[in-house]
Structures are given as structure tokens and as C-alpha cells.
């Protein structure tokens, strides 16, 4: 018996919608990364993108435990000398709530071209409205 290897053209990808309201950031991110990668499928193949499309709504209502709301810091650099910037979780949620989930999930995906392809299948929205109704996403309870 030969080992099954999925081919990119034969992979069936589904669309799911996830409500982030009250979900813990890390636990939600772990499950999203797992499904974007396709590890929940029997035909998972490490070097082929077998994951599904995921639409996350209500990103502004994601939760963190402990004091992370004020203690967790996000860093970025502007590209100029002395241009290091930082913001707390609370400031990031106020400024751009989608980025919080995107950063968490991106760090859990493989680095390189395959990881970037997986990340492109993640669609995050701050509110409850999304423009992927034509894909008829199924509700995924995490």
C-alpha cells in the first residue's frame, strides 16, 4: 500500500465563518492555524496547502486572559532611524482589531511561500458583517 499524497488541484476547500466573540486569542488562533493548514483532514500532506478558507467576524470582541490586555505589547518598525513603535493589546484592539488575530495566526503558520499561501485564506473582520456570503460559509464553532 502506498502513502497517499494530496495534489493541489484535487484538494477540496470549504469556507467557514467563526465568531470570535469572547474566545481566547491563543486558543482561537491555534484552531484557525490548524484548519488553515489542513491538519484536521485525513488527506493532510505537509508540503501541500490542504486547508480551508476561514472568515473571522467580531475580531474586536476577542478576549485575553490575565493582565494581557495592558501587559501584552506589539512592536513594529517604521523603517526610519529610531522608528521602533509599540502598542498594548488594548490600543491595538481600538486601532485595528483585525491585526491582533492576524498576527497571532501568522506566527503559528509555517514560514515561507506555503505559509503565506495558507495565511491568504484567512479573512478577518472587526464587526459582524463580511462580504463572503456568496461562498456560503458554514458556521464553525470553536
From Swiss-Prot:
**Alphabetical UniProt keywords:** Ribonucleoprotein, Ribosomal protein
Q: Which Pfam families match?
A: Ribosomal_L13
Query: What Gene3D superfamilies does the annotation carry?
Result: Ribosomal protein L13 (3.90.1180.10)
Q: Name one GO cellular component term.
A: cytosolic large ribosomal subunit
GO BP of this protein = negative regulation of translation; translation
Q: Source organism's superkingdom?
A: Bacteria
Gene Ontology molecular function terms on file: mRNA binding; structural constituent of ribosome
What this protein is reported to do is described as: This protein is one of the early assembly proteins of the 50S ribosomal subunit, although it is not seen to bind rRNA by itself. It is important during the early stages of 50S assembly.
| Assembly and interaction partners | Part of the 50S ribosomal subunit.
Q: Which family does it belong to?
A: Belongs to the universal ribosomal protein uL13 family.
Alphabetized HAMAP family for the sequence: Ribosomal_uL13
- Cross-referenced PANTHER family: LARGE RIBOSOMAL SUBUNIT PROTEIN UL13M (PTHR11545:SF2), RIBOSOMAL PROTEIN L13 (PTHR11545)
**Name assigned to this protein:** Large ribosomal subunit protein uL13
Q: Which organism is it from?
A: Histophilus somni
Amino acid at each position: 500500500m502506498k502513502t497517499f499524497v494530496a495534489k493541489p488541484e484535487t484538494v477540496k476547500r470549504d469556507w467557514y465563518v467563526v465568531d470570535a466573540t469572547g474566545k481566547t486569542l491563543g486558543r482561537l488562533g491555534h484552531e484557525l492555524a490548524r484548519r488553515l493548514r489542513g491538519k484536521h483532514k485525513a488527506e493532510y500532506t505537509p508540503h501541500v496547502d490542504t486547508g480551508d478558507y476561514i472568515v473571522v467576524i467580531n475580531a474586536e470582541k476577542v478576549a485575553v486572559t490575565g493582565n494581557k490586555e495592558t501587559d501584552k505589547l506589539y512592536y513594529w518598525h517604521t523603517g526610519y532611524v529610531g522608528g521602533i513603535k509599540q502598542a498594548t493589546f488594548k490600543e491595538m484592539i481600538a486601532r485595528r482589531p483585525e491585526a491582533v488575530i492576524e498576527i497571532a495566526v501568522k506566527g503559528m503558520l509555517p514560514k515561507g511561500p506555503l505559509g503565506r499561501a495558507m495565511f491568504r485564506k484567512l479573512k478577518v473582520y472587526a464587526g459582524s458583517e463580511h462580504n463572503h456570503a456568496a461562498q456560503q460559509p458554514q458556521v464553525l464553532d470553536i
